Structure formats: structure tokens, C-alpha cells
């Protein structure tokens, strides 16, 4: 009687109730997911097959027949290593939840029920099969810690089962990848013939790829995913051709119809066990996470949500219902599985045939394979390397010319490996061994009968065979694998993206091998990185390097060795010929995503990687900066003053950047070198260099220390000294740099740095001497100017205002002279009068009072300026305000639509408004003129005109031609291809007139200046 195990067998349930229970149990099944397992190529975790008598839908149900009734050892192994430990942990969590339940009577009732049943049946089949216990099971499965435990049990358990029952371990009919073969008449149809060990056909599986009009599926978080491609597999219901058992696991596809990576793959599995008549019977359906269908019809495709992504399964609603009915009829069971490739396991009564896997070789020289590699999902398809006979050539026949013949004669990839291993055993010369491996790789990649997937699988098999071969010395193994990698690189028929997958898989085999030392692994890794960096398109290079880095992180290496491997990857990227931008991207990924987040790189390794990244970033910054400088220098619409301002801004940005002082110095050196080598007049270049020097000297001491300023200033002079321009021009620019230092109030250390820059430059001694003289002359001239200014200060300017004692004396003398006649007249009349001395004292006292008031007013003004709320600003702040004010004026001008409004704006805001500095108004005019000229439109593409413009007011004045000797400014002819001026002539004229007025403003010091 099986009713106690099977709620669906209870005749009190209606058919609808049975279906409801069945769906609930399927959803219960979804609560546990099997994480991707570590695997070798073709390493697939298979399900348990059993002879139990109930079609329970839960992986934890325990409704498996007693051991005595189970003939399938795989089922027994799954029960003992996976299902029962999971049940034990689940019951433990349920008991914890019951202890916290507020309904103490119900809690005690369920606790006793569990204890009593456990004494009779440790699998607790009745408890798990009772729908009344559903809420307790669901609540327990919501516990995140329990989920982790169940997943860890699955990982360890399925790994154990695979190692025991894989074909590579010698288990008859062990697991192997499906060999799909394209249909001759239709590209969307594929098929594979499944045979038992005796070679008798069990069935033919047909796969159809469906290209459909995109439809939308919603995920649990509400986001939507479009599906445009999926596949259907015609799973057999009845099998009556041959005896044996069969287990099919078909990978669920991503939303775009492609296969996911191994660590994200989920499967739909059908288990066919040998029935009473020897023929396979469908006994189990293993479906991942809650199964849903994209519609209500029988043709609706099944899908699941796994890890936040939508995956389609290769079964429709109609096929699924048909299979479930057969499972119930055959009294099967369903369990959860998660594998990484479509696989088949077929069992029968005959001797196992050779499989197309790298592990099965008859050569005793190959060590047993290690099952620790994580290889990307590569499903071999179509037939293997075809053959007519499996006769193996003798070792003396091994040479590059005969290897292709051997491949053509090979009955399978295994035969090729046997052939290679025989040659490696007989051949002592390591060079010839490597040649043999190389030619084998060429034979695989050149085989026209293999598709890309099969070539990938066979190349990986060859690499693993090389790593595990005992007849190869360690250095020969390195050279052999590197030869395979080089062959991949040189192959012209394999797409780069597919090559990247081969590289990733090969590195996984190498790093996880127990037959290699870390040094040898690193050598192979570096070769793989070299090949990856040599791929032609950016996406393939990124895929290769990222894949290799992921393999390093997931490998079984120690954390220290992982860090060493990542550093090796970074070093290869750093010395490659890639652009700095691409290097930054790849190194940033190694440092942050792969190294730091995965906690693999040590602090010292992180620092080393960061240095690589800083260096590359500095090179890129240098290139970007020099491009900006060149754009400014060669802009014909900006004068020297504007060029200087813009290059000063660039210099300031460099000084404020995150780079080291040495890197900043290198960039500043490039700036001055670029300016010095430009085609501008020497005076213009000197003016720009002066601005650079002033910017460095005045930069904030808090962000740039004095020693660093000196270092950068030396670099600035070195850029001038080493420029490819004549010596007089370099002397003039050196003087300009020194003038800038004095303008910026730079100290003697900064000035001395100019000499250091000259000494360190790569020029001859005579040029160094000349530049030092120019520097000294500029310094002396600057000191003379300072001394003269100081002397003038002592002499006094505006004597009447600043020398009050002179004012008193002169005023007193005037008073005396005026009073004397009055005194004389009064004396004549003998009337009492005020004496002249008394009047002088009174007048003097009044003047002193006025002076005192003036002094107090001045002192109060200074106090206000120096107070925390005062408006005293640094040079940098003033520059920022100027730039901001210019932008505001330009923006305001842009709001004026008519010519009259624009002319009025120019007069009011630029000519008449003396509260604005000359610099702000002139810069505004220059910017407005540039915008007027840049607003030119193409009227007649076929017409070319010329425009004569003033290069710079500071340019050296030369006659433009013999016919026009009186022109007073240097001019150049600017060719303007296919452009015709449409600017507003009135506005341009008004702007240029305003510029002339402002430049000629009276600078007499007696003119009152309104202070803000």
C-alpha cells in the first residue's frame, strides 16, 4: 500500500484537487536551487533514478522507496548525500519556528507529530507529503540561513555523485555531453541519437529552435523581459526500441535564446529507468524553480526566473502535462537539479564505448583527470573528428606531415588523444613533443567537419591532456600548452570571441591542475593573456581578459597565488600596445572588481596595480591636455591674452589634479614644450609662458608644497630648453617664465628651480649657459623694478595727499601771508586783535583734526577688508569671478534679440560700466567676437573666400607686402573653405569699437576708482 507516501493516491481527492496538490508540490520544489558546481568540460551533475512507487514533486519529500526497493545506485547516492541531509536541516528549522509560534497547542501538536513519525520513518515521508504541513515547510524555507545550508549540501552532494558515476571514473554509461547534429534541410532543426552501451538505439531526440515575434514576460520585481527565441525538445514518452535506462538534462536558455554560463545554468531533466520489460520508463521529472508557462495553450513554452533572470525551458505546456501523466503512471519521482550542459546518460548491458572526452584514454601515461576545473559551457555538437578506422600509427610516423593523416583516420577525438599520447610516450626530444601537440591543435581547428563548439571542446581536451601527461616534463607542459595557445592565436577561421572562450577554459584547466607549480601556471597564464590582447576587436579582447581574471578568482589557488596571477595579468596589460583608455578600463577591472572586491590582492599588490593605473592615467591625461593646448594655440580667433588665460586655466587644473608632483611636472613640461614649439611669434609665446610661471608661483601652498612647486617649475623650464626652436626664442621664453615667477611673488627657491631645469635638460653646454644668462638677466631686471618701485614709494606719490606734515607747513605759510596785512591794519587803529601766531595755531589745529579723521577712516577701511567678513580675495578667486562674470555677460548678451538691443547692451555694460575691470570687459568682447564669427553659415559651398585678420596686438610688426609698406600690424590670410560670413556687421563693429575705447581708457591715477 503506497497511499501513506502519496497524497495523490488517496481516492478522496478529486482530479482537480490532485492537480492543485501537484502544482503546490512543484512550487515547493522550487524553494531549493542547486548552485553551479565546479566542473570539467562535460562535467554534469545528474539526477537520481529510482524505483519508488510515488510521483511526489518535492526534492525534500522523502517519498522514495526503501533502500531494498531501489535498484539505481545513483538514486541511493542522491538520497543519502543530498535529500536526507536537507530534510534533517529543514526539520530542525521547522522545530525552531514551532518554538516561536504563538499558538502553543498547535506548536506542541506538530512537534509531537514530527517526533513520533521520526521514530518510525527517519525520512518523515508522511509529514512532508501532508498538505496540512505546507505552511510550516514554506515558512522554514524562507529562512536565508537554511537556504545556504541546503545549497551547500547540494554542492557537496552532487560533486560526490558525479565523481562516483562519471564515465571518466570508469562508471559504465557515465555522463557525457549531447552530440547534436544539424538537420540537412533546416537550420533550425537538430537531432541526436541516444544509444545504450551495447550500441542499440534507445531514441532519437529532436530539437527545434523557435524564432518568434517578441513577447514580454514579467519578473517578480515588475521589470519586463522580451523573448524572441527559444527551443523545444520532443522528449519521448514511451521507449520500446532497446533495453536500458536514460537520463536527459537540457539546459534552460537565456531570454535571447543563448546558453548561460555554467555557474548560472539551470536544467529540465527527464529520468528514464529500466522497467520490468527492460525498456526505459519515464520515472522522474526534475524541474527547476517554480515552473511557469508563457500562455494557456498547449504550445506555451515553459520558463522560470532564476537569479533575477528569465530562462526558457525546452518543454511546452502540452508536452509537460503528457510527461507528468507518464510519470504518475510509472510511479516516478521528481527532484531538483542544476547542471551546465545538455547531457545524456545511457545504460545497458554491454561494454562501454569510447566517449569523446579528454579523460578517457587507453594510454597509461595520462594521470586521472582532476575535477576541479570550472570550464565555460561548451557543448560539443555534431559528429566528432570523423574516421574510417581507429588504427593507431606508430610513434616513428609522428611528424607534422603525417599528423593530419592520422587525424583523418581517427575515429574520434579520443583516438586523436591516444595517437598523441603514444607519440609523447615514444618521443624523448621535447621539441618534437611540442611539435606534435601543435600539429594536433592545428588538426582540430582545421577540421572542416567540426563546428565551433566541437573545436572548442577538442582544444580544451588537448590542453588538459597535455597538462596531465606524465611523459612530459614541467617545462615541456608549459611549452605544449603555450603551443596550443599560439595555434589558437594564428587560426584564421575561428572568430575572436570564440577564441576568448578557448583561452578562458584553457587557463581554468591550468590553474586548477595539481600537476603544475605556480611558476609554470603563471607562464601559461601570461601566454593566454598575450593571445587575448592580440585579438583584433575590443569586445573579444575585453571578454578574454575578463574571462581569464574570473577564472583566477574562482580557481583553487591560494589567495596569495591568486593575487600574483592578477598582478601578472595587469603587467601584461600595462606593457601592451593597447590605447591608454583601454588599458585603464582593463586595469581598473583587475584592481577594483576582481582584486579588491574579491579580496584577492594584498595591500602591496593593490598599490603596485594602482601605480600602473596612475601611470597610464597620467599618459592619457598628458595627451588630452596637450590636445587642448594645441587647440588653443592654433585658434585664429583668439588673441594672445585669451590664449594665455585659457592655458593658465589648464595649468591650474593640472596642478589641482590627483597625480603625483612628478607626473604634474611631466605634464607642465609638455605644455611649455608645446607652446615653445608652436608657430606663434616669440613675444606671444613668452607672454603665455609668463602666465604659466605666474600660475605655478601663485598656486595654493596647501595643495602644492614649495618643494613640489620648485620641481614643477624646473620641469616647465626643461620643456622650454628642450623645445625645437631657436635659442633667442628660448632665451626670451625663459625670461618670460622668470617674469611670471616674480609677478606671482615666487620666492628664491622657485627662481632657483629654473636653473635646475636648465641643468637637467638635454641640450649642449653653450645653450645651457645662454639660457642661464637670460634667466639671471630677467632676475636682475625684476629686482631692479622692485627696487625702483620701493624708491618711488619713499619719494612719495601724490605728495599733497600722503605727506600731511608738508600740507600743514604750506597751509600755515599761506595763513601767515594772508593774516599779516590784517595785523598791520589793525595795529594802525590800535584795536585788540588776535596775533598771527594764535591764528596759525588755530588753523593748524583744524587741519590736524581733518587729518586725524581721514586716518581713522582709512584704518577702518583696512580693518573691514581684513575682517573675516571682508571681501579680500585671492588671485585664484578673482580669476574665477572674472571667468564667471564673463560667462554671465555673454549669456545676457545672448538674450538680446535685436541689433538695437545688442548695441545698447554693449554701450551700457561694456563701455559705460566702469565698475567692471578692463580685463572682464575685454575678455567678454573677445568671447562675443568669437561667437559672432563661429556663427557663420554655409551659403555657397562652392565659394572659397579669404579673410585677413590681426594675429595679435603683440605680434612683431612687419609690412604685409612691398605694395603696402604702411600697414602697422602683422596680418595673416586665413583660408576659409566653403564658408561665407553672415554675421551682423553692426554688432561686430560695435564690439571692436568698444574694445578700442576700453583699451584707451585714461589710466591717470587721479581718476577716482570706485571700489566694491
From Swiss-Prot:
InterPro entries: Rickettsia_antigen_120kDa. It is found in: Cytoplasm. Transmembrane segments: none annotated. Keywords: Cytoplasm. Residues 12-27 have a biased composition (Basic and acidic residues). The lineage of its organism: Bacteria, Pseudomonadati, Pseudomonadota, Alphaproteobacteria, Rickettsiales. Its main location: cytoplasm. The keyword Translocase does not apply. One of its GO terms (cellular component) is cytoplasm. Residues 47-61 have a biased composition (Low complexity). This is Antigenic heat-stable 120 kDa protein. Pfam families: 120_Rick_ant (PF12574). Residues 62-73, 348-373, 380-396 have a biased composition (Polar residues). It comes from the Bacteria. Residues 1-73, 348-396 are annotated as: Disordered.
Amino acid at each position: 500500500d503506497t497511499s501513506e507516501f502519496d497524497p495523490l493516491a488517496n481516492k478522496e481527492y478529486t482530479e482537480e484537487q490532485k492537480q492543485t496538490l501537484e502544482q503546490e508540490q512543484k512550487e515547493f520544489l522550487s524553494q531549493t536551487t542547486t548552485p553551479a558546481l565546479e566542473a570539467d568540460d562535460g562535467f554534469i551533475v545528474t539526477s537520481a533514478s529510482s524505483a519508488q512507487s510515488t510521483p511526489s514533486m518535492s526534492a525534500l519529500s522523502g517519498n522514495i522507496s526503501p533502500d531494498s526497493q531501489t535498484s539505481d545506485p545513483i538514486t541511493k547516492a542522491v538520497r543519502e548525500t543530498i535529500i536526507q541531509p536537507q530534510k534533517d536541516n529543514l526539520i530542525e528549522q521547522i522545530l525552531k519556528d514551532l518554538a516561536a509560534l504563538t499558538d502553543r497547542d498547535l506548536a506542541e501538536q506538530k512537534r509531537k507529530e514530527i517526533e513520533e513519525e521520526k521514530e518510525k520513518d527517519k525520512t518523515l515521508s508522511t509529514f512532508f507529503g501532508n498538505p496540512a504541513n505546507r505552511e510550516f515547510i514554506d515558512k522554514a524555507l524562507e529562512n536565508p540561513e537554511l537556504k545556504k545550508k541546503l545549497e551547500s549540501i547540494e554542492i557537496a552532494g552532487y560533486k560526490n555523485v558525479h565523481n562516483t558515476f562519471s564515465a571518466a571514473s570508469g562508471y559504465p554509461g557515465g555522463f557525457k555531453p549531447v552530440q547534436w547534429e544539424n538537420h540537412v534541410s533546416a537550420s533550425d532543426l537538430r537531432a541526436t541519437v541516444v544509444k545504450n552501451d551495447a550500441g542499440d538505439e534507445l531514441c532519437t531526440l529532436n530539437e527545434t529552435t523557435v524564432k518568434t515575434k517578441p513577447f514580454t514576460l514579467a519578473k517578480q520585481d515588475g521589470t519586463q523581459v522580451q523573448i524572441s527565441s527559444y527551443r523545444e525538445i520532443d522528449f519521448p514518452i514511451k521507449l520500446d526500441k532497446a533495453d536500458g535506462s536514460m537520463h536527459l538534462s537540457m539546459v534552460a536558455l537565456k531570454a535571447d535564446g543563448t546558453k548561460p554560463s555554467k555557474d548560472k545554468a539551470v536544467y529540465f531533466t527527464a529520468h528514464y529507468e529500466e522497467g520490468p520489460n527492460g525498456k526505459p520508463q519515464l520515472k522522474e521529472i526534475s524541474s527547476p524553480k517554480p515552473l511557469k508557462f508563457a500562455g494557456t495553450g498547449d504550445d506555451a513554452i515553459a520558463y522560470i526566473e532564476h537569479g533575477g533572470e528569465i530562462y526558457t525551458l525546452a518543454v511546452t505546456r502540452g508536452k509537460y502535462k503528457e510527461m507528468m501523466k507518464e510519470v504518475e503512471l510509472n510511479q516516478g519521482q521528481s527532484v531538483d537539479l542544476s547542471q551546465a550542459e545538455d547531457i545524456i546518460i545511457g545504460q545497458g548491458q554491454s561494454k562501454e564505448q569510447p566517449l569523446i572526452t579528454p579523460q578517457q584514454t587507453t594510454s597509461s601515461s595520462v594521470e586521472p583527470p582532476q575535477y576541479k576545473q570550472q570550464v565555460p559551457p561548451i557543448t560539443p555538437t555534431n559528429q566528432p573528428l570523423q574516421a574510417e578506422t581507429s588504427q593507431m600509427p606508430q610513434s616513428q610516423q609522428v611528424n607534422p606531415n603525417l599528423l593530419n593523416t592520422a587525424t583523418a583516420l581517427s575515429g574520434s577525438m579520443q583516438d586523436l588523444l591516444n595517437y598523441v599520447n603514444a607519440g609523447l610516450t615514444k618521443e624523448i626530444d621535447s621539441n618534437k613533443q611540442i611539435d606534435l601537440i601543435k600539429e594536433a591543435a592545428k588538426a582540430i581547428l582545421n577540421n572542416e567537419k567540426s563546428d565551433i563548439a566541437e573545436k572548442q571542446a577538442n582544444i580544451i581536451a588537448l590542453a588538459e591532456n597535455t597538462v596531465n601527461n606524465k611523459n612530459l616534463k614541467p617545462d615541456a607542459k608549459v611549452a605544449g600548452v603555450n603551443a596550443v595557445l599560439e595555434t589558437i592565436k594564428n587560426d584564421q577561421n575561428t572568430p575572436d570571441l570564440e577564441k576568448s572562450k578557448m583561452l578562458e577554459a584553457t587557463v581554468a584547466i591550468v590553474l586548477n591542475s595539481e600537476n603544475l607549480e605556480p611558476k609554470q601556471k603563471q607562464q601559461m597564464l601570461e601566454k593566454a593573456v598575450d593571445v587575448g590582447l592580440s585579438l583584433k576587436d575590443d569586445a573579444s579582447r575585453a571578454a578574454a581578459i575578463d574571462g581569464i581574471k574570473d577564472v583566477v578568482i574562482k580557481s583553487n589557488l591560494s589567495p596569495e597565488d591568486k593575487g600574483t596571477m592578477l598582478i601578472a595579468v595587469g603587467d601584461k596589460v600595462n606593457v601592451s600596445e593597447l590605447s591608454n583608455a583601454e588599458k585603464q578600463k582593463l586595469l581598473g577591472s583587475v584592481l577594483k572588481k576582481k582584486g579588491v572586491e574579491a579580496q584577492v590582492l594584498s595591500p602591496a599588490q593593490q598599490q603596485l596595480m594602482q601605480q600602473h593605473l596612475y601611470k597610464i592615467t597620467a599618459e592619457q591625461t598628458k595627451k588630452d591636455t596637450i590636445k587642448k593646448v594645441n587647440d588653443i594655440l592654433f585658434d585664429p580667433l583668439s588673441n594672445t591674452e585669451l590664449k594665455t588665460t585659457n592655458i593658465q586655466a589648464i595649468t591650474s587644473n593640472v596642478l589641482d589634479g590627483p597625480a603625483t608632483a612628478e607626473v604634474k611636472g611631466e605634464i607642465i613640461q609638455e605644455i611649455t614644450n608645446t607652446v615653445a614649439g608652436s608657430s606663434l611669434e616669440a613675444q606671444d609665446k613668452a607672454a603665455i609662458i609668463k602666465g604659466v610661471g605666474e600660475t605655478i608661483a601663485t598656486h595654493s601652498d596647501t595643495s602644492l608644497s614649495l618643494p613640489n612647486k620648485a620641481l614643477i617649475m624646473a620641469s616647465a623650464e626643461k620643456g622650454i630648453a628642450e623645445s625645437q626652436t631657436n635659442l633667442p626664442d628660448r632665451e626670451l621664453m625663459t625670461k618670460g617664465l622668470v617674469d611670471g615667477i616674480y609677478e606671482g611673488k615666487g620666492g628664491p627657491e622657485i627662481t632657483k628651480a629654473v636653473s635646475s631645469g636648465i641643468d637637467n635638460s638635454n641640450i649642449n653646454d653653450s645653450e645651457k649657459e645662454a639660457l642661464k644668462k637670460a634667466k639671471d638677466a630677467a632676475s636682475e631686471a625684476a629686482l631692479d623694478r622692485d627696487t625702483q618701485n620701493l624708491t618711488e614709494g619713499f619719494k612719495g606719490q601724490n605728495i599733497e595727499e600722503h605727506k600731511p606734515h608738508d600740507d600743514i607747513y604750506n597751509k600755515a605759510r599761506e595763513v601767515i601771508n594772508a593774516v599779516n596785512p590784517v595785523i598791520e591794519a589793525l595795529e594802525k587803529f590800535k584795536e585788540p586783535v588776535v596775533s598771527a601766531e594764535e591764528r596759525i595755531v588755530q588753523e593748524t589745529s583744524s587741519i590736524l583734526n581733518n587729518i586725524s579723521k581721514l586716518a581713522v577712516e582709512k584704518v577702518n577701511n583696512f580693518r573691514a577688508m581684513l575682517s573675516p567678513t571682508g571681501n579680500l580675495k585671492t588671485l585664484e578667486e578673482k580669476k574665477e569671478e572674472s571667468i564667471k562674470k564673463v560667462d554671465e555677460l555673454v549669456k545676457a548678451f545672448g538674450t538680446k534679440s535685436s541689433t538695437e538691443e545688442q548695441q545698447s547692451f554693449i554701450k551700457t555694460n561694456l563701455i559705460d560700466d566702469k565698475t567692471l575691470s578692463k580685463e572682464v570687459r575685454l575678455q567678454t568682447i573677445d568671447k562675443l567676437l568669437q561667437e559672432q564669427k563661429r556663427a557663420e553659415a554655409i551659403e555657397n559651398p562652392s565659394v572659397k573666400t579669404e579673410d585677413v585678420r590681426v594675429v595679435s596686438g603683440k605680434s612683431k610688426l612687419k609690412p604685409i607686402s612691398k605694395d603696402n609698406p604702411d600697414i602697422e600690424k602683422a596680418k595673416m590670410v586665413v583660408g576659409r573653405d566653403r564658408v561665407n560670413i553672415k554675421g551682423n556687421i553692426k554688432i561686430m563693429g560695435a564690439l571692436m569699437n568698444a574694445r578700442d575705447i576700453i583699451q584707451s581708457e585714461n589710466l591717470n591715477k587721479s581718476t577716482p576708482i570706485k571700489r566694491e
